[in-house]
Amino acid sequence: MVELEIFEKLPLGGTNIREVPKKLEAEAPALCEKLLKQQVKKLKPQGASLPEGHLVLLLGGSNGILRAVAIQLLFGEKIPVYAVHYDRRMMIGGHHVKAITDLAAARGVDTRWFNADATDPKVIDEAVAEIKKKYKVVHLINGIAAGATKRYKELGAINVPDLDVAYHPVLQYPDFSSSDNIRNFGLVAVPLADDADIEKTNKFMGSSTTLWAEPLAAAGLLARETSIVAFADYDFEKDDPVYGMGPLAGAKILQRESMAKVREKFGGKTIRLCYPAMDTTAIGAIPGGLIMFALSTQVLAEEGKFKNLMQLAEETMEIFKPGYTGNELRADADFQACLPEMHRREPYLTKENIQEHLHLLPKLELP
């Protein structure tokens, strides 16, 4: 294996953070509106259906895979969606939400978004009270991604291979539209987690489903054997030096345990939504995340099996089709199958040839 140089991975691909709020204010509204209309124009109904008085509630949804799910539900299936997201002034999410709510209002589809901490009891109570005014049954999808992308300190420090990729200056996702945006391939350091990191990750990604299930059930909105309670999961490899050996892994285990409790206590139809590595803002923050996405995507594209966020959202609609009885949706089946070939290629990657090894990515419709 070629010896790789260590480089520092910067937030948003090294974007000047001080300039972000000004750039978003100037360019994001029009760009988010344009992108949404382009995506909605291509939507095809997938046959998802919910009875009158039913609502889908998303934890997350302003960006990434749950944004795509929200778009498909609202504009492809005409299903009402409420969401609780948390976006600060320098994040693109709030602008995506504005575009979604404006278009939904124009098309007569009910949606409401709360920009607040989804683990705050006051926020939960407020949202539940608002939902109860109009709806009888809630279906919950938890997509909170707010964990520490670090290793347990007892496992020690490590460097892992990763990419330096330019981000879209406004939409804030790793931008593979040009090979020139792939600027470096080398090693990045994996930070070590402290107790506060572990506690925060467990709160947001481990127990947050239970925080909502209790008050929803108390309000009569979580219907036994009817309400779907799902969470967006990543089925990491057990030997993954970051995801498999830090707070993210621990939180995912807690999340799965909490889902079992929801099923036993409230009779919720619990479903694990397994997604592949995806081209999102969040994956860029995970050491090793970008090379995992890029190389697996290259392999999948060669096989004609790559799916972008909107295509994965279409697949997610399966859980809302009449008669669906599964407890796990494997939207990552092709991704999991491609991992051996991806790992076979890894030793041959260098800083000099990385663009060649990822030559199909600029031809794909990302994210």
List the model feature ranges, each with a label:
Residues 102-104, 290-304:
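Acidic, Ser/Thr-rich peripheral helices and adjacent loops at domain boundaries
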Residues 159-267, 274-292:
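Catalytic loop of short-chain dehydrogenase/reductase
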Residues 107-111, 127-156:
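A glycine-rich helix->loop->beta "capping" turn
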Residues 101-123:
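Rossmann-fold cofactor-recognition segment
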Residues 1-60, 71, 76-78, 88, ...:
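Non-catalytic terminal and boundary segments that flank Rossmann-like NAD(P)-dependent oxidoreductase
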Residues 76, 133-135, 150-151, 214-224:
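A short helix-coil junction within the Rossmann-fold of NAD(P)-dependent oxidoreductases
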Residues 77-95:
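Conserved glycine-rich Rossmann-like NAD(P)H-binding loop of the short-chain dehydrogenase/reductase
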Residues 66-67:
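N-terminal Rossmann-fold NAD(P) dinucleotide-binding loop
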